[in-house]
Structures are given as structure tokens and as C-alpha cells.
């Protein structure tokens, strides 16, 4: 696996801060990396993103483990992560991965949440049968990372940023049932220009 560089200059940390916020890392792991409950439907489905400060699950990650977890959805022990949108992050450029990880590593060590993946029994059965795939099974692990694109309002940069939307909203952003989600989850919205469909944005 490709290791991640540990660079800590101010420009790196600032770019990492931007990516952490704009690529939805904080939605699952919290603004300070201490973990966050982001799904609780009151009917048996509860999902908590783990603490990723130096006091959490990533404390002993060597550089290559960050690449495996973020880009490939694979734990250091080789097992797939059940809830980690690595198909979104698989196309990260090396440059962006190399600024995101140092930003996360500079969080102050704090006590926080452990990962929770509470799903109804039927969902576990479907997962066991392969009907609900994890991210690792949906990724082309041989695909090279994206090449850097210049920041700005351009088609190339928009396509790169939209990689973060495809996993839920589909390759054409038309929405529909979210791949790998339990059957009773709401559909993702159609977010194509000029459309206003119901669904989860």
C-alpha cells in the first residue's frame, strides 16, 4: 500500500482543514475528530463514527494504514470496514490525501466515541449474503489515484469534487436508492441542475 506523507507546514494543515470539512469527514467523525453518532432511526439502526484523534482507533496507524482505510475501506488487519465511504475517497489525489491525514493527526488527543454499527437483523443477513456490499467490494483497488486538477470553477475540478457525491447520488447524480444502504433508508435526491426531486441530499 502507498504510505501517506506526514507534512505539517501551515499550508498543508490549512488545506487539510478545508478537505476535512468539505469532504464530509466531520459528518461522521465530528469537527474535532472525537467521533459522532450520525444515524439513529429509533428502530434498531444506529451508527457512530469512531474517535480518530491520536487517543482513538488510529493512534498506532503507520502511513500505509491511512491509505488502506481511507482509499480502500480496509482495516489494518485486512478486514473490510462496514461503514466507511471509501468509494468516495478512492479517487483522492495523492496530494489531497497527503494534506488530509496530517490535519487529522494534529487533532489534540481526546477521549471520544468508539465505532458502533447497530443494524437490524435482516440487514446483517443481507450483508452476509453480499446483498449489502461494503465499500471495499465496490472499489477497483488497482485504479490509480486521480491526477491533480487546478482549483477553480472548471469542468475537470467539478468532476473531481463530484466523486464525493457519486456513491449516494449515482454516477449521473440522478439519485435513487443508496447502494449498500438498508432497504428502508430514504432515497438520495436527484441533484442534477434544474431538478428538484424528493430525497436525501
Identify the residue ranges that each predicted region occupies.
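Extracytoplasmic/secreted proteins, especially bacterial periplasmic and envelope-associated proteins
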Residues: 11, 15, 51, 61, ...
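Interaction-mediating elements
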Residues: 13, 78, 83-85, 102, ...
Amino acid at each position: 500500500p502507498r504510505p501517506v506523507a506526514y507534512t505539517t507546514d501551515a499550508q498543508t494543515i490549512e488545506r487539510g482543514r478545508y478537505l476535512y470539512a468539505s469532504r464530509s469527514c466531520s459528518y461522521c467523525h465530528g469537527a474535532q475528530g472525537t467521533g459522532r453518532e450520525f444515524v439513529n432511526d429509533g428502530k434498531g439502526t444506529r451508527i457512530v463514527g469512531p474517535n480518530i484523534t491520536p487517543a482513538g482507533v488510529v493512534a498506532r496507524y503507520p502511513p500505509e494504514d491511512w491509505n488502506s482505510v481511507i482509499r480502500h475501506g480496509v482495516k489494518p488487519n485486512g478486514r473490510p470496514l462496514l461503514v466507511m465511504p471509501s468509494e468516495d475517497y478512492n479517487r483522492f489525489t495523492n496530494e489531497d490525501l497527503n494534506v488530509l491525514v496530517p490535519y487529522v493527526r494534529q487533532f489534540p488527543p481526546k477521549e471520544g466515541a468508539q465505532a458502533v454499527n447497530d443494524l437490524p437483523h435482516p440487514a446483517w443477513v443481507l450483508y452476509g449474503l453480499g446483498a449489502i456490499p461494503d465499500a471495499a467490494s465496490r472499489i477497483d483497488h488497482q485504479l490509480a489515484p486521480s491526477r491533480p486538477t487546478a482549483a477553480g470553477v472548471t469542468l475537470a475540478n467539478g468532476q473531481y469534487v463530484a466523486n464525493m457525491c457519486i456513491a449516494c447520488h449515482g454516477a449521473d447524480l440522478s439519485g435513487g436508492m443508496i447502494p449498500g444502504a438498508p432497504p428502508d433508508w430514504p432515497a438520495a435526491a436527484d441533484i442534477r441542475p434544474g431538478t428538484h426531486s424528493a430525497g436525501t441530499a
